[in-house]
Design a protein with these regions (language model features):
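Cyclophilin-like peptidyl-prolyl cis-trans isomerases
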Residues: 1-150
Length: 150
């Protein structure tokens, strides 16, 4: 059948195993007010840049997220260390599906992050991803042609 861009898929939130450290790919979604099940977009995603956070900022963020998600939520030491050293967007943890991460090309991600944006935080000039490869859990790339000619 025909698929539409607004179709969604069930959330697959696996925090703290997967969290919003710098470089992860996560599924966009509509807000909780219209999407209480936190269903993920099938076609829209984002790549996290965020910022490094100190312990005080992480504590404050953890408390805000706990008020939203419940007392079960906390940042394990390993997650805290990643946010202190690499950075990310911890306020999104536990509420969005994380499904991958950048394995090379962080300098490209940084250049995209520095692109001038408009009042809606959208790039003034389109930024297009021209080539991407799927890499399995074993670290090997799926070398099938994805419709793009090199």
């Amino acid at each position: 059948g025909e698929r539409r861009y607004w179709e969604s898929t069930p959330a697959e939130i696996r925090f703290p195993e997967l969290y919003h450290r710098r470089g992860v790919l996560a599924a966009a979604r509509e807000g909780d007010d219209v999407n209480p099940e936190r269903r993920s977009s099938r076609t829209q995603f984002y790549i996290v840049w965020g910022r490094r956070m100190d312990d005080a900022a992480l504590e404050a963020t953890q408390e805000r997220v706990r008020r939203q998600l419940g007392e079960w939520f906390y940042y394990p030491d390993s997650v805290r260390e990643a946010y202190r050293t690499a950075g990310g967007t911890p306020h999104l943890d536990g509420a969005y599906t994380v499904f991958g991460h950048v394995v090379e090309g962080m300098e490209t991600l940084e250049a995209i992050q520095r692109t001038p944006t408009d009042s809606l935080d959208r790039p003034i000039e389109d930024v297009r991803i021209l080539r991407a490869r799927i890499v399995g859990a074993d670290g090997r790339a799926d070398d099938k042609d994805n419709g793009q000619n090199d």
